[in-house]
A protein has these predicted regions:
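Short, structured segments at the rim of ligand-binding sites
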Residues: 1-415
Length: 415
């Protein structure tokens, strides 16, 4: 499937964003470990969270988590502490995404996990019965989801969990988000210093829980505000908390110097909202370390290129093990639009302002990656007509993305 996008002349809209996928998936695992009966409220309706809900309810085997990397990691730990044998499998791409570091860590704690096909990669056969816990050391620069998966099972282990992180710790806001949710459900879990986290052996408490809306989804609306030529544009996004524990709430500070002003307020019903308006761009070049907000990188890279702002972005090492190699994908697709990017050290992207000719009728490949589709869609403000291949990938995190764009005035034609 392919769609053609044309941007609206004016941008004035109020949008209800989807619930946070990151919070939903963590809350569901913790809720299950707590033995809760009523699901958390405002759970995300995206593919990844649907897969998580289905897997937690499924009684037969194997459990197909499709392309949901979060589910693969969190459920590997979850099923290790629950009785029975479960096989976790997924898409062809999922079977190429390494999971050996997490499996080795779980085995160190006593888990019984076998690789069904290829050593170090899914599918996994997990025989439950991990109960002891104890001390564990992990590199800090692995996926934060490995760390979160281990932390969340800590309270149900007899000895709890003491986790040491060595080297550079990346994506720390996601670890902090996990610790916050654990505490919200009654666990005692905290950093004891910059390298160590201690989780006490104290069972979770079933707790009514409401999930806030998604700051990652908000980033695409920030991009639209930055790129629209409408100087009077105004976007209101509902359900976003100013004091959010989501790491991607940093988006409002990131977009401030490139022309987007954020105002926090509550509407007449008391619902927290943000109002986005345009302001002058206050920089000629940008440098930023995305080590703590890797999921914002695609949006920000594309936005800066479209604005003609040279940049050097670091801390991108985790982008290579996401739904696709996002560094390579960004280089290939922005080249189609006339922006030759360069990679350095496997963790940096930079653009010096050089332009090349735009390919006629550019079609953006999405690589089974929802964030590629959503980050490139607003390019139609700059490139008059742009095409997106396999647009349905947005269902992974923001199922109603294209509907919301139509509501604000984008012309979207299925071809």
């Amino acid at each position: 499937m392919q769609i053609r996008l044309t941007a609206p002349l004016h941008l004035r809209h109020k949008t209800i964003l989807p619930a946070s996928k990151s919070i939903s998936n963590r809350a569901l695992i913790i809720h299950a470990l707590a033995g809760g009966k009523d699901l958390p409220k405002n759970v995300s309706d995206c593919d990844d969270t649907f897969v998580m809900v289905r897997a937690l309810m499924q009684t037969d085997d194997p459990i197909d988590i499709m392309a949901a990397g979060t589910a693969m990691r969190f459920l590997s730990a979850y099923w290790s502490v629950n009785e029975g044998t479960h096989t976790l499998t997924g898409t062809a791409r999922m079977k190429q995404r390494p999971i050996g570091i997490l499996v080795n860590a779980l085995r160190t704690l006593g888990a019984q996990i076998e690789y069904v096909e290829t050593e170090g990669y899914p599918p996994l056969r997990i025989s439950g019965g991990l109960h002891e816990g104890g001390r564990l050391s992990l590199p800090g620069d692995v996926s934060s989801q490995y760390i979160s998966a281990l932390l969340m099972i800590g309270p149900v282990l007899r000895k709890g969990l003491e986790l040491e992180l060595t080297g550079q710790v990346i994506s720390r806001p996601y670890i902090d988000l996990t610790l916050k949710l654990m505490k919200d459900f009654g666990a005692q879990a905290e950093w004891t210093d910059e390298r160590h986290i201690k989780v006490e052996p104290q069972p979770y408490r079933p707790t009514p829980y409401y999930i806030e809306n998604d700051w990652s989804a908000a980033s695409y609306w920030y991009e639209m505000m930055a790129l629209t030529p409408d100087k009077d544009a105004e976007i209101v996004l509902t359900g976003l908390f100013a004091d959010s524990a989501q790491g991607d709430s940093a988006v409002h500070g990131l977009f401030e110097p490139i022309g987007v002003h954020t105002e926090f307020f509550c509407d007449d019903d008391g619902i927290p909202c943000v109002r986005l308006t345009k302001q002058p761009i206050a920089t000629e070049r940008l440098e930023y370390d995305f080590v703590n907000q890797p999921d914002l990188a695609q949006t920000f890279v594309v936005t800066c290129a479209m604005l003609g702002l040279p940049f050097r972005f670091t801390g991108l090492q985790s982008l290579k093990i996401k739904e696709t190699d996002r560094i390579s994908a960004l280089i290939r697709e922005l080249d189609k639009l006339g922006y030759p990017l360069h990679e350095a050290c496997g963790s940096e992207l930079f653009w010096d302002g050089q332009r090349t000719e735009v390919r006629p009728h550019p079609a953006i490949d999405t690589y089974e990656d929802h964030r590629m589709a959503m980050a490139f869609a607003p390019c139609c403000f700059v490139v008059p007509e742009i095409y997106i291949n396999h647009p349905q990938v947005v269902s992974k995190s923001y199922p109603h993305y294209w509907d919301h764009l139509k509501e604000v005035g984008f012309e979207i034609t299925a071809l």
